[in-house]
């Protein structure tokens, strides 16, 4: 069985676990570091005693690493030589300490991170900026990014606000062509070419001359023919519809007066009484002043 291979972990002592770790001297092979100093600081073997006490007292047996095979190992180095300290030019000991004295000669492994953080210099402090070899940690998004975002937001806000402030003073409500069209156009008294006015048109105001000529024509003939209506309309500067409506209203007014008076309507001279009550549009009698064109059979 190769015992040298099994005990190879003793040939490479740990030099990066603390400021007071030990390594083998340069004039001796790597296995010259005593195993007593490597495990003296742990409570399992040395009970936390300093290494100087173990070296001065030769009565204590040399502690050996545990072995499942039950084989004892000799001491790899004589007790007359003191172990050499680790080179301080490398390792984490030059940046921070763990709060353990160098003369203790043992490893110090705290159970939590509180002691390690308490012993760190200013360069590793919470918020302090020191002159250590490493720069202080920076947040992922620093003040430069925040300032950049703020300046970009200000530019965007200025671009949005500048046109809005000038638009209300310059813009005027625009009127389109479809807005000019009236949904309910006002009624006008304009008569079409055929003489038919719009339904529900305005009331016609007749002049005194027009009323006198219409009353004179109604006295001689209550019912007019189409030709006579056209002639009277042309003479009085009216249309045929206006003359027709006036004669209808005048006949209704005459009948109302006769009903109120209780007398029989008298026909024009030279006409029989039967023809006076005829409600037909054609007239069976003629007046002396009537034109020949108004005579109908």
UniProtKB/Swiss-Prot annotation:
Q: Which PANTHER family does the UniProt record give?
A: HOMEOBOX PROTEIN HOX-B1, HOMEOBOX PROTEIN ROUGH-RELATED
Q: Which gene encodes it?
A: Hoxb1
For this chain the motif Antp-type hexapeptide maps to 175-180
Q: Which GO terms describe its biological process?
A: anatomical structure formation involved in morphogenesis; anatomical structure morphogenesis; anterior/posterior pattern specification; embryonic skeletal system morphogenesis; facial nerve structural organization; facial nucleus development; positive regulation of transcription by RNA polymerase II; rhombomere 4 development
Record's keyword terms, sorted:
Developmental protein, DNA-binding, Homeobox, Nucleus, Transcription, Transcription regulation
What's the protein name?
Homeobox protein Hox-B1
What does UniProt give as GO cellular component? Answer: nucleoplasm
Task: Spell out the molecular function terms from Gene Ontology.
Answer: DNA binding; DNA-binding transcription activator activity, RNA polymerase II-specific; protein domain specific binding; RNA polymerase II cis-regulatory region sequence-specific DNA binding; sequence-specific DNA binding
> Which species is this UniProt entry from?
Mus musculus
Q: Out of the domains of life, which is the source?
A: Eukaryota
Q: PROSITE patterns recorded for this chain?
A: HOMEOBOX_1 (PS00027), HOMEOBOX_2 (PS50071)
Where is it localised?
Answer: Nucleus
Provide the family line: Belongs to the Antp homeobox family. Labial subfamily.
Region listing for Disordered, in residue ranges: 38-74, 124-144, 251-297
Q: Where is the composition biased (Polar residues)?
A: 52-70, 280-297
Residue numbers of the DNA-binding region are 199-258
Q: What does this protein do?
A: Sequence-specific transcription factor which is part of a developmental regulatory system that provides cells with specific positional identities on the anterior-posterior axis. Acts on the anterior body structures.
> What CDD domains does its record include?
homeodomain
